[in-house]
From Swiss-Prot:
Functional note: Plays an essential role in viral RNA transcription and replication by forming the heterotrimeric polymerase complex together with PB1 and PB2 subunits. The complex transcribes viral mRNAs by using a unique mechanism called cap-snatching. It consists in the hijacking and cleavage of host capped pre-mRNAs. These short capped RNAs are then used as primers for viral mRNAs. The PB2 subunit is responsible for the binding of the 5' cap of cellular pre-mRNAs which are subsequently cleaved after 10-13 nucleotides by the PA subunit that carries the endonuclease activity.
GN (gene name): PA
Cofactor entry: Mn(2+)
UniProt organism field: Influenza A virus (strain A/Malaysia:Malaya/302/1954 H1N1)
Signal peptide per UniProt: none
Cited Pfam families: Flu_PA
Compartment(s) where it occurs, according to its Swiss-Prot or TrEMBL record: Host cytoplasm; Host nucleus
Residues spanned by motif Nuclear localization signal 2 (NLS2): 184-247
Protein name per UniProt: Polymerase acidic protein
Top EC group: hydrolase
Top-level lineage group: Viruses
Source organism phylogeny: Viruses, Riboviria, Orthornavirae, Negarnaviricota, Polyploviricotina
One GO cellular component, as annotated: host cell cytoplasm
C-alpha cells in the first residue's frame, strides 16, 4: 500500500500526509491504510479549491491554470494540510476579518464567496452514515459539510453542493480511479474495511469477536448491525422527540413542554416549625475526650482496660445531677443509669483481675432506658385474622421542623483541622506501573490534606462504635453489655493516643433480619452547656457530672463537665454501613481525582503535583448566601470529605429522596447555564417531590438551604 500511495499521489501531498501522521505519532509503515486515506482527503481538498477564483466584482469564476488572470483572489482558503498551529492561526485570522464564528474543530476549507467553513469528508462507507458522524462531531450549523464516496455518491448540508457539477465530477472520477487502481493491486478490500468512522476525542475502541457478535445481537428491533445503530444514535436530533412521544400517549396525559428560563425556578420551600434537633448516633463537635498518651498499661488494646485507664486521668468527678431534662423521659432513670455505670466500673477496679467485657446488672432504670419488655407482644397472623376490627397501628405524621444554625456549625467544624492524625497510610508495596505511581502520589497528597481533619476523626469513631456494637450484639444477645466509645490517633509528634468519649449500654439484641433493631443508651462526655441551644438537645437528658480544669490564656479555668444521655437504636444493616465509613475517604478522593483529570486533559499532562502544590490557587467549595465560597485545595478535600461523612452519619429516607429529586432540578439548571434551552413539564410536581422530603432532618434541611443559594447565584 505504501508503494502504491507514493506512485499514485503528488509528492507534495505525500509529504504533507507524512508530516500529519508524524504530528499525531502514527507510523505510516504500520498504518498504511490511514496513510492512503489522508492522501486521498488532501487531494480532494486541493481539487475542491483548484481553478476557483473570485473576480473584482466578487463573482465566483473558474479559471484554468495557464490563464494569465490566475492572480485573481482564490475562492477557497485551504486549512487542511497545514500544521495545527498554523491552521488555527489561519482560522483565527479568517474569523477576525470576516466575523465568522470560530469552529470547535479545525475545518478543511473556507469559502470566501459563501462566507462559511467547509468540512470535506471522503468515505468508503455509505455517505449518509459518514455525514451523520461528521455532523454529530462538529455540532455546528455554521460549518458546511460535503461528503464524497468512492462509489460516486455525495451528500452535503441542505443539499447545497457549493461547486458546479463539472468540478464535482472531476473529484468523483479521481476517487473512482483510486478505487480501481487499489482493486487491481488487491488493496481495496483491506482499505475499505479499515475505515473506523469519524473519531472524536474519545477514540472508538475496536469491538471484535464475541463482543461484536453480542453487540449485534443486543440491538433494538429494526437495526441489523451495530454500525447502523451507532449512526442513528449519533445523528439523533432530540428536539421534538419528547413532544412526538407525548402525542402518542393516552389523552389523559396532558403535558405541555414549557421553556425553562432564568425566571422560571423558585426557591425550595423549607418547612416552618420548631428548630430541628441533633439525631446522630454519637456527639460530633460537642464531644469531649478523656485521653492517655503512649498507652503501655496492662491489657492495652482491650477496650474496657483502656476505658478504665482513661477514666483515671480525670479527677473532677462530682455528684451528678440533671441540668437539661428530656421532655418525655423519666429523667431520674438516666441519672441512676450513670451512677450505676460509675459503681460497676468501681467494682471492676476492686477485683483482682479486670474482665475483658462487662455486662451490667439488669436494674429497673436500665430496663426502662433500653425498652425491655416494652415491645408489644407479637401474635401469629393466623390466630387473629378473623378479628373484625384488626388494623395497623395509627402512627402520627412526623412534626415539621425548621432549619437551625447548629447544623451549619457542625458541618464547618467537621471541615476543620485537629491537632491529631486519624489515619495511617497502609503499606501496599512498591508501585509497578506508571499509573500506580500516579495513584500513589494522589493518595499521599490527599491523605496529607485530610489525615488531621475532624471529619476523619468522625469516620474512625463511627467505625469503632459500630464494630463494637455489632460484635456485642452477636456475642452477648441477652446481656446489657457496657461498650466504651474509644478512638485511637497520633499526636503531631507521632505519639500514640487512646481516647474515651463515653459509654454505650446495649439492650437485648436477637437480630434475625437486617432491619431488626437493637436499643442502646449512649452516655457521652461534653463541655457544651445544653442550655445554650436546648432545641438541639431535645432527645437528650443532660447531667452535670464534674468540673474540668482547662489551660487558657489567663491560666487555669474550671469548666463544668456534662454527660449527654439518650436512648437510641440501630440495626444490623446500619451497623454494617457504619463499619464501612472509611469508604467516605475513597468517595471524596475520587471526586478530587476527577478534578485533577479535567485539569490534566486540558494541559495534556498529569497535573497532580501542580494541583496540590500550587498554594496560591483557589477552588470553588460551595454556595452560601454570600456567593460562591472558594478555598485552597486542602479545604476542598476536607469539605468533600465532610459532605460524604455527613451523608453517612445522617443517612435517611429523607436524604435519599431529596438527593434524587433535587438532582433532576440541578441538571435542568445546569442545562440552562450551558445554553441548551431546556424544556420541562410538571415542574410543580418536581418541586412537590423535592419538598415532601423536607420534614425534620437537619442535614437534608441544610442541603436544601445550600441548593437555594446555588439557585440564586446560578441564575443571576
Amino acid at each position: 500500500m505504501e508503494d502504491f500511495v507514493r506512485q499514485c499521489f503528488n509528492p507534495m501531498i505525500v509529504e504533507l500526509a507524512e508530516k500529519a501522521m508524524k504530528e499525531y505519532g502514527e507510523n505510516l509503515k504500520i498504518e498504511t491504510n490511514k496513510f492512503a486515506a489522508i492522501c486521498t482527503h488532501l487531494e480532494v481538498c486541493f481539487m475542491y479549491s483548484d481553478f476557483h477564483f473570485i473576480n473584482e466584482q466578487g463573482e465566483s469564476i473558474i479559471v484554468e491554470l495557464d490563464d494569465p488572470n490566475a492572480l485573481l483572489k482564490h475562492r477557497f482558503e485551504i486549512i487542511e494540510g497545514r500544521d495545527r498551529t498554523m491552521a488555527w492561526t489561519v482560522v483565527n485570522s479568517i474569523c477576525n476579518t470576516t466575523g465568522a464564528e470560530k469552529p470547535k474543530f479545525l475545518p478543511d476549507l473556507y469559502d470566501y464567496k459563501e462566507n462559511r467553513f467547509i468540512e470535506i469528508g471522503v468515505t468508503r462507507r455509505e455517505v449518509h452514515i459518514y455525514y451523520l458522524e461528521k455532523a454529530n462531531k462538529i455540532k455546528s450549523e455554521k460549518t458546511h459539510i460535503h461528503i464524497f464516496s468512492f462509489t460516486g455518491e455525495e451528500m452535503a448540508t441542505k443539499a447545497d453542493y457549493t461547486l458546479d457539477e463539472e468540478s464535482r465530477a472531476r473529484i468523483k472520477t479521481r476517487l473512482f480511479t483510486i478505487r480501481q487502481e487499489m482493486a487491481s493491486r488487491g488493496l481495496w478490500d483491506s482499505f475499505r474495511q479499515s475505515e473506523r468512522g469519524e473519531e472524536t476525542i474519545e477514540e472508538r475502541f475496536e469491538i471484535t469477536g464475541t463482543m461484536r457478535r453480542l453487540a449485534d445481537q443486543s440491538l433494538p428491533p429494526n437495526f441489523s448491525c451495530l454500525e447502523n445503530f451507532r449512526a442513528y444514535v449519533d445523528g439523533f436530533e432530540p428536539n421534538g422527540y419528547i413532544e412526538g412521544k407525548l402525542s402518542q400517549m393516552s389523552k389523559e396525559v396532558n403535558a405541555r413542554i414549557e421553556p425553562f428560563l432564568k425566571t422560571t425556578p423558585r426557591p425550595i420551600r423549607l418547612p416552618d416549625g420548631p428548630p430541628c434537633s441533633q439525631r446522630s448516633k454519637f456527639l460530633l463537635m460537642d464531644a469531649l475526650k478523656l485521653s492517655i498518651e503512649d498507652p503501655s498499661h496492662e491489657g492495652e488494646g482491650i477496650p474496657l482496660y483502656d476505658a478504665i485507664k482513661c477514666m483515671r486521668t480525670f479527677f473532677g468527678w462530682k455528684e451528678p445531677y440533671v441540668v437539661k431534662p428530656h421532655e418525655k423521659g423519666i429523667n431520674p432513670n438516666y441519672l441512676l443509669s450513670w451512677k450505676q455505670v460509675l459503681a460497676e466500673l468501681q467494682d471492676i477496679e476492686n477485683e483482682e483481675k479486670i474482665p475483658r467485657t462487662k455486662n451490667m446488672k439488669k436494674t429497673s432504670q436500665l430496663k426502662w432506658a433500653l425498652g425491655e419488655n416494652m415491645a408489644p407482644e407479637k401474635v401469629d397472623f393466623d390466630d387473629c385474622k378473623d378479628i373484625s376490627d384488626l388494623k395497623q397501628y395509627d402512627s402520627d405524621e412526623p412534626e415539621l421542623r425548621s432549619l437551625s444554625s447548629w447544623i451549619q456549625n457542625e458541618f464547618n467544624k467537621a471541615c476543620e483541622l485537629t491537632d491529631s492524625i486519624w489515619i495511617e497510610l497502609d503499606e501496599i508495596g512498591e508501585d509497578v506501573a506508571p499509573i500506580e505511581h500516579i495513584a500513589s502520589m494522589r493518595r499521599n497528597y490527599f491523605t496529607a490534606e485530610v489525615s488531621h481533619c475532624r471529619a476523619t476523626e468522625y469516620i474512625m469513631k463511627g467505625v469503632y462504635i459500630n464494630t463494637a456494637l455489632l460484635n456485642a450484639s452477636c456475642a452477648a444477645m441477652d446481656d446489657f453489655q457496657l461498650i466504651p466509645m474509644i478512638s485511637k490517633c497520633r499526636t503531631k509528634e507521632g505519639r500514640r493516643k487512646t481516647n474515651l468519649y463515653g459509654f454505650i449500654i446495649k439492650g437485648r439484641s436477637h437480630l434475625r433480619n437486617d432491619t431488626d433493631v437493637v436499643n442502646f443508651v449512649s452516655m457521652e462526655f461534653s463541655l457544651t452547656d445544653p442550655r445554650l441551644e436546648p432545641h438541639k438537645w431535645e432527645k437528650y437528658c443532660v447531667l452535670e457530672i464534674g468540673d474540668m480544669l482547662l489551660r487558657s490564656a489567663i491560666g487555669q479555668v474550671s469548666r463544668p463537665m456534662f454527660l449527654y444521655v439518650r436512648t437510641n437504636g440501630t440495626s444490623k444493616i446500619k451497623m454494617k454501613w457504619g463499619m464501612e465509613m472509611r469508604r467516605c475517604l475513597l468517595q471524596s478522593l475520587q471526586q478530587i481525582e476527577s478534578m485533577i483529570e479535567a485539569e490534566s486533559s486540558v494541559k495534556e499532562k498529569d497535573m497532580t503535583k501542580e494541583f496540590f502544590e500550587n498554594k496560591s490557587e483557589t477552588w470553588p467549595i460551595g454556595e452560601s448566601p454570600k456567593g460562591v465560597e472558594e478555598g485552597s485545595i486542602g479545604k476542598v478535600c476536607r469539605t468533600l470529605l465532610a459532605k460524604s461523612v455527613f451523608n453517612s452519619l445522617y443517612a435517611s429516607p429523607q436524604l435519599e429522596g431529596f438527593s434524587a429529586e433535587s438532582r433532576k432540578l440541578l441538571l435542568i439548571v445546569q442545562a440552562l447555564r450551558d445554553n441548551l434551552e431546556p424544556g420541562t413539564f410538571d415542574l410543580g410536581g418536581l418541586y412537590e417531590a423535592i419538598e415532601e422530603c423536607l420534614i425534620n432532618d437537619p442535614w437534608v434541611l441544610l442541603n436544601a438551604s445550600w441548593f437555594n443559594s446555588f439557585l440564586t447565584h446560578a441564575l443571576r
